[in-house]
């Protein structure tokens, strides 16, 4: 299935593939 991009992040990168960091949470690219 599609990756779930729910981790928190602050100006960095996301551990989940296909996700980008939009402070303060990762969102799907």
Curated annotation (Swiss-Prot):
Modification after translation: This is a cyclic peptide.
UniProt keyword annotations, A-Z: Disulfide bond, Knottin, Plant defense
InterPro entries: Cyclotide, Cyclotide_moebius_CS, Cyclotide_sf
Cross-link Cyclopeptide (Gly-Asp) per UniProt, renumbered positions: 1-29
BP term (GO), one: defense response
Pfam families: Cyclotide (PF03784)
Keyword field contains Nucleus: no
Disulphide bond pairs: 5-19, 9-21, 14-26
Domain of life, source organism: Eukaryota
Family to which this protein belongs: Belongs to the cyclotide family. Moebius subfamily.
Known role: Probably participates in a plant defense mechanism.
Domain notes: The presence of a 'disulfide through disulfide knot' structurally defines this protein as a knottin.
Protein name (record): Kalata-B11
Organism: Oldenlandia affinis
């Amino acid at each position: 299935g599609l990756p779930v991009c729910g981790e928190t992040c602050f100006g960095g990168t996301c551990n989940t593939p296909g996700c980008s960091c939009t402070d303060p949470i990762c969102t799907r690219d």
